[in-house]
Amino acid sequence: MRLLEERIKKDGQVLGEDVLKVDNFLNHQVDPELMAAMGEEFKRLFEGAPITKILTVESSGIAPAVFSGLAFHVPVVFARKHKSLTLQDNMYSATVYSYTKKVNNHISISKKFLNENDRVLVIDDFLANGQAVEGLLEIIDQAGAQLEGVGIVIEKTFQKGRELLDQRGIHVESLARIAAFEQGEVVFLDENNEN
């Protein structure tokens, strides 16, 4: 998605060898016009899929997921990372490793929001090692729901997340695919003449 790639080039900040900071428009301050465009693009990419729910993990996946839910006209459910006093029993849960924060998170979703009749599209902000998506897939399996696909805002193709999902035959669409970080700059996959 050219609009997103341009925004990453303009406002993204490469930290070290494998971290991209996009807090200016995605995961701290949110650009609603960009989010709306991303929601419409996910709608186009998964056109025809009988999606009944959008699923993500709090907190950075919420904005793109909500705008995708708006485009699909379906509810959005986000997995919570912290136990809540209002969410005690009847939960689906999984443990996921946060690549950026280097910690394990226990994620959970109330059973009343996901069931065997749901056809789910997972939306998340980043795909690196695939841990967040794997956790959501575990929850989808627990619910007996059916996965329709995974939509990723920014994919780091130099990490193993896509490979893990491809091995499972999962339909994955990423709006921006990063091939590398070179000298503090983002190199997108299409700039490397790769597909």
Swiss-Prot record:
Biological process, per Gene Ontology: purine ribonucleoside salvage; xanthine metabolic process; XMP salvage
Show the InterPro entries listed in the entry: PRibTrfase_dom (IPR000836), PRTase-like (IPR029057), Pur/Pyrimidine_PRTase (IPR050118), Xanthine_PRibTrfase (IPR010079)
Name the EC number(s).
2.4.2.22
Q: Catalysed reaction(s)?
A: XMP + diphosphate = xanthine + 5-phospho-alpha-D-ribose 1-diphosphate
Pathway it works in: Purine metabolism; XMP biosynthesis via salvage pathway; XMP from xanthine: step 1/1
Q: Which UniProt keywords apply?
A: Cytoplasm, Glycosyltransferase, Purine salvage, Transferase
User: Binding positions for xanthine?
Assistant: 20, 27, 156
Name the enzyme group at the top EC level: transferase
Q: Which GO terms describe its molecular function?
A: xanthine phosphoribosyltransferase activity
Quaternary assembly: Homodimer.
Function, please? Converts the preformed base xanthine, a product of nucleic acid breakdown, to xanthosine 5'-monophosphate (XMP), so it can be reused for RNA or DNA synthesis.
What does the similarity note say? Answer: Belongs to the purine/pyrimidine phosphoribosyltransferase family. Xpt subfamily.
Official protein name in the record: Xanthine phosphoribosyltransferase
Underlying gene:
xpt
